[in-house]
């Protein structure tokens, strides 16, 4: 009886220790996540911009939902921030960009802390009233049973024309008096997720 009691206690303890990571989802950590994009003007001058407000979840069924607050764009020039909001993103009509996809969470659960794996990840980007299916290569890093990082391995190229942003780019070019602004935009990201406890 004592042996059975010890075995039962062992399995109960193991279940309690593993439950948060095995059965809960993950919450995006905005303070340790970033989405960057590069604008190229005059065919040779590149500048890095980013968004300050990100939110999202990776659910225990593998469904990922990421929200980018477009009004949080930061270009390090105040008037340019305002112009992007009004002329490019039209945040009065389209305040957010949304990313959705499915991850292999079973593979993540089986990973050891400190291990990584690379995968060609498909997802849907909902931006400026248009949805596009896209694929990019990402690296998943399991820092611990409570924290993972999903980051781009190489820049992803967003074509402004796919999201009806060409007119906005042209407005920015005209008001800034530039000869050109590229409509092909490189994007990189690093997203940190913390396990949700129940």
Located regions from the model:
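Bacterial N-terminal signal peptides that target proteins for export
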Residues: 2-11
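Short, charged low-complexity linear motifs
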Residues: 12, 23-24
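N-terminal signal peptide c-region/cleavage motif recognized by signal peptidases
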Residues: 19-20
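Low-complexity, acidic/polar, glycine-enriched regions of mature
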Residues: 24-198
């Amino acid at each position: 009886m004592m042996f059975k009691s010890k075995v039962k206690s062992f399995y109960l303890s193991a279940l309690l220790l593993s439950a948060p990571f095995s059965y809960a989802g993950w919450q995006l950590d905005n303070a340790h996540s970033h989405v960057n994009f590069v604008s190229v003007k005059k065919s040779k001058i590149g500048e890095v911009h980013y968004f300050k407000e990100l939110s999202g979840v990776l659910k225990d069924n593998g469904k990922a939902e990421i929200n980018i607050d477009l009004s949080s764009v930061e270009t390090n020039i105040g008037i340019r921030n305002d112009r992007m909001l009004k002329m490019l993103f039209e945040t009065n009509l389209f305040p957010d960009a949304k990313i959705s996809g499915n991850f292999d969470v079973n593979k993540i659960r089986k990973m050891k802390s400190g291990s990584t794996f690379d995968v060609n990840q498909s997802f849907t980007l909902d931006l400026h009233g248009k949805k596009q299916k896209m694929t990019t290569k990402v690296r998943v890093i399991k820092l611990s049973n409570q924290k993972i990082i999903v980051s781009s391995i190489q820049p992803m190229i967003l074509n402004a024309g796919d999201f009806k942003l060409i007119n906005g780019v042209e407005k920015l070019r005209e008001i800034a008096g530039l000869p050109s602004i590229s409509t092909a935009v490189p994007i990189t990201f690093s997203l940190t997720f913390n396990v949700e406890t129940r």
